[in-house]
Amino acid sequence: MGDARLDENAHVPVYTVNKDAVTYAKRLIDTRQYVLRSRWQDVQPRAREQNAFLKTHSWEEYAAWHLGLTEGADEETKARYAFVYGDFRRLHRLGLIACHYRAAEWRHKAIELAAHELLQYLDRKIAS
């Protein structure tokens, strides 16, 4: 009998934190470019909104809205960017919560912590 164990996350992509996106999210918070209450499922950018944004913005600007970078994915492809937290105009508190939840669900600890820290940062700014 071998010691082979089934890795339940074997086919789950690996992500690193997009530090530029964290910096951009903090800038949005500092300049009050956020929505505290929204229906994230209604405002989360879908393919149509993503494509429209990319027609008039750079990949660098697109990347700034995503907390995760997919390891191994080609640069300047949508597959490279994950964990969107805003609607390409404003940060959404529920977008950060969705990032936190999804990262925790799939055990992407660095993304989970980045989303959590941004939530705390936002909540401190609101309270002050």
What feature does the model see in each segment?
Residues 2-128:
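A charge-rich, low-complexity, intrinsically flexible signal that marks solvent-exposed coils, linkers
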